[in-house]
């Protein structure tokens, strides 16, 4: 193991959920026909699950298929100069029943894209994992040529 690898901390499930609550945007990975695809989503944590809202389309159709999904969210702590990444894997269900739907409408879900976002989808986790790591000082990866102006075709 190198020194760089030893600085990566595997997060507890509890720490993963705490960090997920600090973010509101993640990437949803789904299986679409014969290939994986990734969609940015706004989400909220709700009682050990992740909820997002969307309109009808490829993302919702793929999420509601029998294939499992994954959600990845990440962030950066300016005080500690550490970054984190959390992945939630699981299955989904559409929220459509009376009180469940009413409770979900109160979640802080604010889609960035305009349009109909009347479908609420819940990710029910089967696994949750994450890691935290220090951000590398740019002097470690910058080269003497990093700032050189390049030709337009490069």
Model features per residue range: what roles?
Residues 34, 58-60, 137-138:
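Short, surface-exposed beta-strand-loop junctions and turns on beta-sheet-rich folds
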Residues 29-31, 53, 72, 124, ...:
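Beta-strand residues in well-ordered beta-sheet regions across diverse protein folds
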Residues 23-55:
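Short beta-strand segments
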Residues 38, 42, 51, 70, ...:
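Conserved hydrophobic/aromatic beta-strand scaffold that supports enzyme active sites
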Residues 1-3, 44-45:
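Short, basic, glycine/proline-bearing loop/turn elements
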Residues 3-27:
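Short, basic/aromatic recognition patches
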Residues 2-4, 81-83, 100-154:
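C-terminal edge-of-domain segments
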Residues 56-119, 127:
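Short, structured beta-strand-loop surface elements
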């Amino acid at each position: 193991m190198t020194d760089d690898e030893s600085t990566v901390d595997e997060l507890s499930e509890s720490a993963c959920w705490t960090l997920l609550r600090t973010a509101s945007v993640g990437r949803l990975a789904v299986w679409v026909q014969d290939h994986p695809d990734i969609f940015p989503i706004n989400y909220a944590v709700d009682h050990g699950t992740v909820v997002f809202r969307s309109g009808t389309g490829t993302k919702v159709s793929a999420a509601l298929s029998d294939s499992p999904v994954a959600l990845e969210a990440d962030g950066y702590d300016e005080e500690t100069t550490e970054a984190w990444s959390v992945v939630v894997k699981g299955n989904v269900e559409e929220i459509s029943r009376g009180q469940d739907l009413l409770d979900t409408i109160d979640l802080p879900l604010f889609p960035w894209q305009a349009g109909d976002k009347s479908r609420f989808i819940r990710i029910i986790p089967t696994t949750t994992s994450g890691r935290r790591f220090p951000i590398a000082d740019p002097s470690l990866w910058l080269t003497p040529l990093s700032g050189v102006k390049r030709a337009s075709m490069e």
